[in-house]
A protein has these predicted regions:
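Transmembrane beta-barrel strands of outer-membrane/channel proteins
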Residues: 18-22, 75-79, 112, 123-129, ...
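Repeated loop/turn-to-beta-strand initiation elements of outer-membrane beta-barrel proteins
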Residues: 13-16, 70-73, 118-123, 173-176, ...
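Residues on the lipid-exposed face of transmembrane beta-strands in outer-membrane beta-barrel proteins
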Residues: 2-8, 54, 62-66, 110-114, ...
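C-terminal beta-signal and adjacent terminal beta-strands/loops
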Residues: 176, 236-244, 265-318
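Solvent-exposed loop segments that connect transmembrane elements
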Residues: 27-53, 85-99, 137-152, 187-207, ...
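Gram-negative outer-membrane beta-barrel transporters
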Residues: 12-16, 129-131, 152-245, 315-317
Length: 318
C-alpha cells in the first residue's frame, strides 16, 4: 500500500485536506478438506483446491475545514474497501474455490465542534451517511448438498446517522457528559439464501443498529486528606434492535438501560480502593445470537450479557 496527504491553506480560517491510499490486496489460498468417514457429512470425500482474490483500489479522503473563534466545522468525503476472500466451513472443492466479493464504502460526514465557557464546556455534532456496496455478511447457510456451511453474502446498504455530544464542568469537582446517537441503517439489496425460496430483505433494518442511543455520565472528584475520592455513575440507553438479520424474539433486544456505579479512593501511598456495581438494575439482555439453518431444523444460539456485578477492588502500582 502507498498513501499520502497534503493540507492546503485556502484562507487563514479555511483549509483543504487531500489524501489518498492505493493498495493491492492479493489473497491466494489453499483449501483442504479431510475425513476419516467417506460418504458421511460433512466432508463426503477429501479434497484440495486453490483459488484467491486480487483487489487493486484507490481510496481518497477530502476534508474542507473551517475554524471560528472557538469552534471548528468540517465536511469530509472518503471511500474504503474490504477485500474478498475464502469462505469458511466449506465441505467440497466447488464451494471452497469461490471467494466472496470485496466490500466498498462511500462516506460523507459533516461535523461541528465548539468550546464554550472558557474551555469548561464542549459541544459536538456530526451528521454522516454511509453507502455500502457488496457489504459482507457472515451467515450459517447450506451448501449445494443441503449441508450446513458458512456463507458470506454481499448486499447493498445505506446508513444515515447523527451524533450529538455535550461535555461540561458543573463545578470545579463535577463533570457531566451527555451524548446521543441516531441511526437509520437499512438494506437496499440483500437476498437471504438460508430460506427456500430465498428471502428478499431489501428495506429491512440492519443488525446491531438501535435507532436511538443515549449515554449519560456524571463524575465527582473530592480531594481529601486521605486521598482523592472519585464517584461516578453512567447510564446507557438503547431502544429496540436486533442481533441478526431476522427480527424475532430469540434475536431481538428490547429497550435496554444499563446503570453502572463506581466509587474509588486513590491514597497518597499509591493504593487504590474501589467499589463498583455494573448493571445495577440487573437487566437481562442478549449480547450475541446465531440463527440455525431452517432447512436443517432451525434453532437459535445466543449468549447473554453480564448480570448485576457488585465488588470491591484493591490495587497498587510498584
Amino acid at each position: 500500500a502507498v498513501f499520502g496527504n497534503v493540507t492546503i491553506p485556502l484562507r487563514e480560517d479555511l483549509s483543504l485536506f487531500l489524501g489518498g491510499r492505493y493498495s493491492v490486496l492479493d489473497k491466494p489460498y489453499n483449501y483442504i478438506g479431510s475425513t476419516n468417514a467417506l460418504g458421511a457429512p460433512l466432508v463426503f470425500a477429501p479434497f484440495t483446491t486453490s483459488s484467491g482474490s486480487t483487489l487493486k483500489e484507490f481510496d481518497p479522503k477530502i476534508t474542507l475545514e473551517k475554524t471560528f473563534d472557538n469552534a471548528l466545522g468540517w465536511v469530509t468525503y472518503t471511500t474504503a474497501t474490504k477485500s474478498g476472500g475464502p469462505g469458511f466451513a466449506q465441505w467440497n472443492a466447488a464451494d471452497a474455490s469461490k471467494p466472496y466479493e470485496a466490500e466498498e464504502l462511500e462516506m460523507i460526514e459533516f461535523g461541528y465542534k465548539a468550546v464554550l465557557n472558557d474551555g469548561a464546556t464542549q459541544v459536538e455534532a456530526i451528521l454522516y451517511t454511509y453507502d455500502y456496496t457488496d457489504h459482507q455478511q457472515i451467515l450459517v447457510g447450506t451448501n449445494s448438498q443441503g449441508q450446513p456451511a458458512g456463507v458470506v453474502v454481499n448486499g447493498d446498504a445505506t446508513i444515515n446517522g447523527v451524533e450529538l455530544s455535550y461535555r461540561t464542568y458543573l463545578n470545579e469537582n463535577t463533570n457531566l457528559a451527555l451524548s446521543y446517537a441516531g441511526i437509520d441503517a437499512e438494506w437496499d439489496r440483500f437476498m437471504d439464501p438460508r430460506t427456500t425460496p430465498s428471502t428478499d430483505r431489501a428495506g429491512e433494518k440492519m443488525a446491531f443498529a438501535p435507532e436511538n442511543s443515549i449515554n449519560l455520565a456524571l463524575e465527582n472528584v473530592q480531594y481529601l486528606n486521605i486521598g482523592e475520592l472519585t464517584s461516578a455513575i453512567s447510564i446507557v440507553y438503547k431502544d429496540k434492535y436486533k442481533l441478526a438479520l431476522v427480527d424475532w424474539e430469540p434475536t431481538t433486544v428490547d429497550d435496554l438501560t444499563l446503570v453502572n456505579l463506581t466509587v474509588g479512593l486513590d491514597t497518597p501511598s499509591g493504593w487504590n480502593i474501589s467499589a463498583f456495581c455494573n448493571n445495577c438494575t440487573d437487566d437481562e439482555y442478549k449480547m450475541v445470537a446465531l440463527s440455525g439453518v431452517r432447512a436443517q431444523g432451525g434453532g437459535n444460539r445466543y449468549g447473554f450479557g453480564d448480570g448485576r456485578r457488585i465488588g470491591l477492588q484493591l490495587s497498587t502500582d510498584f
